[in-house]
Amino acid sequence: MALTAGIVGLPNVGKSTLFNAITQAGAESANYPFCTIDPNVGIVEVPDDRLQKLTELVNPKKTVPTAFEFTDIAGIVKGASKGEGLGNKFLSHIRQVDAICHVVRAFSDDNITHVSGKVDPIDDIETINLELILADMETVEKRITRVSKLAKQKDKDAVFEFEILSKLKEAFESEKPARSVEFTEEQQKLVKQLHLLTSKPILYVANVSEDEVADPSGNENVAKIREYAAGENAEVIVVCAKIESEIAELEGEEKQMFLEELGIQESGLDQLIKASYSLLGLATYFTAGEQEVRAWTFKKGMKAPECAGIIHSDFERGFIRAETVAYEDLLAGGGMAGAKEAGKVRLEGKEYVVQDGDVIHFRFNV
């Protein structure tokens, strides 16, 4: 599933440094034919300890983790919604992503100038958010012009849409994003069709200095970002982009030792990948055989045939059953034979909603 998070941020906040760390740590693109091969797209493996344990259990010839795409979105400055900087290009790029990772500067460094002359994370956040709101306002106003005539004539669909558009316009006038507006399930379907930038889920990435990454509790800027994000019900990940680019060059034990020296349990990049994955409502199921153990990304709530289709359209078209076992039960049984003996392997049909951590063998006939 080619879902993408777009990385945005003002100049000199550490966005490019973080994105370069992502591309350095990049996954082998040959394993992921769906991924865009583009210099502004970084493909990363989704860290998952379960895959390693399955590999040890099954001992396959090949192990393939699931991957996630980050897009580096350049060109945002004050006035981007009016085409300033790389404004129009920026807006078209951000429309294509599924979620937004907003990198915010939370470090002080006199050698790195800030675009507005001072480090003010809330001002930075609001500058970008306002550009997105202004772009969405333009979309909504154009739509209102089109719909209002029909709404006045009491056209049922037009009245329904006009009500939604008016609600959105009111939010934008108060400088609030579309995701902050409550809609019914039916209304939400229409909002989705508008492809609004501010309806995309968001997480904030606070970029701190090297000496604060292990314990950012004394950083006032991080506290401000957390407080702002809490008002949006958004998550905050604390990273040091400079350190991440160093970590990206290390592997295995060397990487672990470096993290321990810094007093960090998990790299900021791994936290960012997991948080982005979760933000989009994604989960992982596994296929495990002698040839290959592989992790597959699916959207929570998907049924077995749809998940089978992620592997190949024939699997969905000719779906018969999904032989399924929970990852924990497979491990506890010491393998498929033990899990079957314990009665933990199930044959699931077309209506089965796949769960995170399911290990599945699909039966199909085309």
Swiss-Prot record:
PROSITE patterns on file: G_OBG (PS51710), TGS (PS51880)
Protein keywords: ATP-binding, Magnesium, Metal-binding, Nucleotide-binding
Gene3D superfamilies, per database record: 3.10.20.30, P-loop containing nucleotide triphosphate hydrolases, TGS-like domain
Pfam families hit by this protein: MMR_HSR1, YchF-GTPase_C
Name under which the protein is recorded: Ribosome-binding ATPase YchF
Superkingdom per UniProt: Bacteria
Limits of the OBG-type G domain: 3-259
Gene behind the chain: ychF
Null mutant phenotype: No visible phenotype.
NCBIfam families, A to Z: redox-regulated ATPase YchF
Organism: Bacillus subtilis (strain 168)
Function summary: ATPase that binds to both the 70S ribosome and the 50S ribosomal subunit in a nucleotide-independent manner.
InterPro entries assigned: ATPase_YchF/OLA1, Beta-grasp_dom_sf, G_OBG, GTP-bd, P-loop_NTPase, TGS, TGS-like, TGS-like_dom_sf
Family classification: Belongs to the TRAFAC class OBG-HflX-like GTPase superfamily. OBG GTPase family. YchF/OLA1 subfamily.
Chain residues that bind ATP: 12-17
Ligand binding (Mg(2+)): 16, 36
One GO molecular-function entry: GTP binding
Cofactor(s) needed by this chain: Mg(2+)
Keyword Plastid set for record: no
GO cellular component, one term: cytoplasm
Domain TGS: 281-364
Upregulating conditions: Weakly expressed during exponential growth in rich medium, stops at onset of stationary phase. In minimal medium is more strongly expressed and continues into stationary phase, part of the ychF-rpsF-ssbA-rpsR operon.
SUPFAM superfamilies: P-loop containing nucleoside triphosphate hydrolases, TGS-like
